[in-house]
Amino acid sequence: MADSTGPISLTVHGAAGRMGRRVVALGLADPNFQLVGAIDHAKSDHLGQDSGAVAGEAPSGIEISSHWPVLDDAATNQAVIDFSLPEAIDGCVEHCVKVGSPLVVATTGLSDEQKQNLSEAAASIPVVWAPSMSLAVNLSMKIAEQITAALKDVAGGLDVEILERHHRFKADAPSGTALKFGELIAGQLGESTSHVHGREGHTGARTREEIGYHAIRVGDNPGEHTIVFGMLGEKIELNVAASNRDCYASGALAAAKWLIHQKKGPGLYSMFDVLGMSDN
């Protein structure tokens, strides 16, 4: 891996998207980074346009392109942040493996096959992948695990429901973050846990083994998750909400810094690793 001194040469994959623009904007403002590439799909209306201007900032001198940049200095620190779509991720991973670039994957809605491809890529390069780049969300996931562990055997039983709210443009439901909350909670509840997505009609009484998911798509909500832990006589509601998209962009940049500055070798890492909260 490259030496960890000097600015990180940053390429943003999905640079013309809502999240990619914020990564570009925050990356340009951060002296730890030097933007060297802004990639979008071949049919993007923004090809050839300055990535800084597209992001609403001063011109960066880096045009949005469908072709990956060729770095002049192979020893330069480099990292790729991917905020694209599932159909675009495979080419990004292939490129990073080819050039040996550390990769931060923030795209959600990946198939099982794509997740497996990420795991295989991580044998060659360091990869951070998480369903949410938000520091607050990842901390909340650890809190949700602790609440579940403490209350799973409470008299009368523990009911867990997950509500998530996102903007009308979000394509996948439930969100990857909601599913990760559920995965961690189920890990505490046991193997018999079932996952129920919404309810309609005469469903009968709720079973103690269920985790319920409810997805709301409205307006421009950048993301909100509420985990309800219900017991007989009382409840806990754990709520984490984004005020804007910058929390996701800054989290992705923090992950890229972590990969480079900690000189991480090949492996599949999570935001728990970035935050120093991993159980491994």
Curated annotation (Swiss-Prot):
**What EC number(s) does its UniProt record assign?**
1.17.1.8
Task: Spell out the InterPro entries in the cross-references.
Answer: DapB_C, DapB_N, DapB_N_CS, DHDPR_bac, NAD(P)-bd_dom_sf
Q: Which UniProt keywords apply?
A: Amino-acid biosynthesis, Cytoplasm, Diaminopimelate biosynthesis, Lysine biosynthesis, NAD, NADP, Oxidoreductase
Q: In which pathway does it act?
A: Amino-acid biosynthesis; L-lysine biosynthesis via DAP pathway; (S)-tetrahydrodipicolinate from L-aspartate: step 4/4
SUPFAM superfamilies noted in UniProt: Glyceraldehyde-3-phosphate dehydrogenase-like, C-terminal domain, NAD(P)-binding Rossmann-fold domains
The entry's family comment says: Belongs to the DapB family.
Report the protein name in the record.
4-hydroxy-tetrahydrodipicolinate reductase
